[in-house]
């Protein structure tokens, strides 16, 4: 009964420190009414766990005259073996030899209880440790005292985090913060340079386009000038308008703008001409043919050259502004009719 109760208590509460002392109290209560209490206590004091088998053999080989005493010793040793062997002998007084116990007057203290180094106690101890405070305290001590970043605690929440993967380097120390700020400032300084360089390139491209556009109509202006001189030589255009326009490239360039073309067309309509510019052009050609029959070949050649040159200029203008085809034709007709 005693052994079963001890076993059940030990299994139910493995972390209880009183379970080892319960065995001794039960044995002492069992032996309290016996007359041989002093004798048993002396035997228990001289008992050694390592030499228990030898002591049992010596008790069984004793003389027959001490039969009663051998019975009592055998019964008590059996009762003693029913106890928990791994824990109870640590609290007994048998580890010290009998000679030393008899000679020494100092009280003998029991040896400290062994800690069961199994998995359950280890897990229990680890679960009771604080993770956050210990990690912060260990990290602070290690950083200031030992100049080490790695914390000493195994339960640190910041241990082994790859900060370079999550972009957390600038939060680790002030030096990295300063480096990050320096990089940002350098990027801010380089970005205006690029922004300034791009408008310069754009302006250069714009100037190149203007230069190309200014150089493009020069050939056409020379052709128009030659055509005008031919028309003046044959009396198609009055020579009063020539000195004002000859050598002035801006005038020819201004004539090609849509606003000037509109103004010229509206001015022709406001003058009250009943006939269209195309009709006036045809009439002028017919009158010239009737007035000078001798020079018919020259007039036809001039007319053909004019008709050839007019589509050339109109095509160039149509390529630029195809929607303003009617205004261009009206302006050309009005210029040649004058």
UniProtKB/Swiss-Prot annotation:
- List Phosphoserine occurrences by residue: 119
Quote the Pfam families the UniProt record gives.
Answer: MBR1
Q: Where is the composition biased (Polar residues)?
A: 307-316
Q: Which InterPro entries match?
A: Mbr1 (IPR031443)
Region span, Disordered: 50-72, 267-318
| Top-level taxon of origin | Eukaryota
Q: Where is the composition biased (Low complexity)?
A: 50-70, 267-306
Task: Cite the entry's keywords alphabetically.
Answer: Phosphoprotein
Give the coiled coil ranges: none
In the record, the note on similarity to other proteins reads: Belongs to the ISF1/MBR1 family.
Tell me, what does this protein do in biology? Could influence the NAM7/UPF1 function, possibly at the level of mRNA turnover. Participates in mitochondrial biogenesis.
Q: What is this protein called?
A: Increasing suppression factor 1
Q: Which organism is it from?
A: Saccharomyces cerevisiae (strain YJM789)
Lineage, highest ranks first: Eukaryota, Fungi, Dikarya, Ascomycota, Saccharomycotina
